Amino acid sequence: MSPQTETKASVGFKAGVKDYKLTYYTPEYETKDTDILAAFRVTPQPGVPPEEAGAAV
């Protein structure tokens, strides 16, 4: 049987969820003629920020 090795979670990859507004949300984005836009009505649950609820769509 091979010996066990210890792995460190902080090396190479850090698991977890980042806030949408910190990674992808860009309110200053200007649309282009080639963009395809879609609209959804989203009502966040109590305690959920609107941009996080929108990110789930």
UniProtKB/Swiss-Prot annotation:
RuBisCO catalyzes two reactions: the carboxylation of D-ribulose 1,5-bisphosphate, the primary event in carbon dioxide fixation, as well as the oxidative fragmentation of the pentose substrate in the photorespiration process. Both reactions occur simultaneously and in competition at the same active site. Signal peptide: none annotated. This is Ribulose bisphosphate carboxylase large chain. One of its GO terms (molecular function) is monooxygenase activity. The modification N6,N6,N6-trimethyllysine is found at residue 14. Its EC number is 4.1.1.39. GO terms for biological process: photorespiration; reductive pentose-phosphate cycle. Keywords: Acetylation, Calvin cycle, Carbon dioxide fixation, Chloroplast, Lyase, Methylation, Monooxygenase, Oxidoreductase, Photorespiration, Photosynthesis, Plastid. It catalyses: 2 (2R)-3-phosphoglycerate + 2 H(+) = D-ribulose 1,5-bisphosphate + CO2 + H2O; D-ribulose 1,5-bisphosphate + O2 = 2-phosphoglycolate + (2R)-3-phosphoglycerate + 2 H(+). Gene3D superfamilies: RuBisCO large subunit, N-terminal domain. InterPro entries: RuBisCO, RuBisCO_lsu_fd_N, RuBisCO_lsu_N_sf. It is found in: Plastid, Chloroplast. Residues 1-2 form a propeptide. Belongs to the RuBisCO large chain family. Type I subfamily.
